[in-house]
């Protein structure tokens, strides 16, 4: 992917669609990722080192931030390592992503695909959230989140944006939209919005498929 390609501008801002893939496909992916043999890896929502990097303007660490542990499972990543497939779930995940993109009227070029699992965290009180961030260095990209299971733990999208010319982190974040997880719901939003997750406080787990992509038509 070349950053020199002319970007024609975002056609979409924030879009939420329910029942986005066939039910049997939604049931199948949930069944596989909650199986005892599915490989999960312990991570943080954002690496702690990135919070203190003075020239990293893609993360925010404010008074409401809770840097939480999570489990992750990488599927595909071309941002840091070139095109690399990391999982035998690739074919199924790619099919899900293509199906979602068709519904969103996107012709995708994928940057990253991964599963994230958040468990309960007692530090998530009213007004608290996980680390606000922008997913990748391509500010002309979209973020797409597919909710694998029913749970609480909203996704929060902020009004504040990043960009290639940003020289500081936002002084204050204001909430633009909250989206509650629901199985077989997906959201698509501009990749230059700061956004974050919240841990569930009622449900046992919150599982999402997190995807970064560009629209070839833009």
Which ranges hold each PLM region?
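Ampiphathic alpha-helical segments that act as solvent-exposed interaction surfaces
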Residues: 1-2, 204
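Non-heme Fe(II)/2-oxoglutarate
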Residues: 2-106
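Catalytic core of non-heme Fe(II) oxygenases with the double-stranded beta-helix
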Residues: 86-218
